[in-house]
A protein has these predicted regions:
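Multi-pass alpha-helical transporter architecture, strongest
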Residues: 104-107, 176-208
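Juxtamembrane intracellular "pre-TM" segments in multi-pass secondary transporters
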Residues: 1-22
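A membrane-interface helix-boundary motif in multi-pass transporters
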Residues: 52-55, 167-186
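A late C-terminal transmembrane helix in Major Facilitator Superfamily
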Residues: 137-174
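Helix-to-loop junctions at the C-terminal end of transmembrane segments
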Residues: 72-85, 171-172
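Extracytoplasmic gate region of multi-pass secondary transporters
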Residues: 16-70, 74
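C-terminal transmembrane helical hairpin of 12-TM major facilitator-type secondary transporters
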Residues: 84-135
């Protein structure tokens, strides 16, 4: 497949595809950077005088937080069949963005609350991913579908590399407050999707 400016312009000129792709980019700014620092966040929770093996427990906690995303994807898929992918994607993106803003404000002494917030964050942070992919697949013309998804995923992972590097560096200086670096992703993603909620339909209905 040849990449040419005409195809790129044709894809960018599709409002629904542009909104879904930009929403996905905001999601990718947050997702992998969050996963990258989950072990460090869990180690802070597990580190206490009463815990003789904080490293071991933090590993189990981190795996649980990241694995909780599977539940988010399953529930998100179920809800998308009734509410539409755009609504589910925006709800998950907004929820994870809200936790991103609130989590650094939680006292370190409230380890149970912090763990609950991380688990909920783990559920929400990835639940929008398949929905954005579905929205893009529905919006792209068949002859450019492969190109649209390749570009969306490639740009998304490039964005992830940047956010991972920045967040990992800032965590050493700011601790949990560095998580605020992730907030622009969900916020910009929601802004990009602002005109799509009214058009969201259940997935079992044929799109226009």
């Amino acid at each position: 497949m040849r990449l040419n400016a005409r195809d790129l312009r044709a894809l960018w000129d599709l409002p629904r595809l542009r909104a879904a792709a930009c929403g996905y980019f905001g999601h990718m700014w947050e997702l992998y950077a969050f996963w990258a620092v989950v072990p460090a966040l869990c180690l802070t929770i597990a580190a206490s005088p009463a815990n003789p093996a904080p490293a071991l427990w933090s590993g189990w906690l981190a795996a649980t937080v990241i694995g909780a995303g599977a539940l988010g994807c399953i529930v998100g898929g179920y809800l998308a069949r009734r509410m539409g992918s755009a609504r589910v994607a925006c709800a998950a993106l907004g929820g994870s963005g809200l936790i991103c803003l609130v989590y650094p404000l939680l006292p370190e002494s409230m380890s149970g609350l912090r763990l609950a917030a991380l688990l909920l964050w783990g559920v929400l942070v990835v639940a929008d991913s398949p929905q954005f992919s579905a929205l893009s697949a529905q919006a792209a013309p068949p002859q450019l579908l492969g190109l649209a998804l390749v570009l969306q995923n490639g740009i998304g992972f490039l964005i992830s590399v940047i956010s991972i590097v920045l967040l990992s560096a800032l965590m050493d200086f700011w601790g949990a407050r560095a998580l605020w670096l992730l907030a622009p992703g969900p916020l910009l993603g929601l802004w990009a999707m602002r005109g799509q909620l009214g058009r969201s339909r259940p997935c079992f209905n044929k799109e226009d």
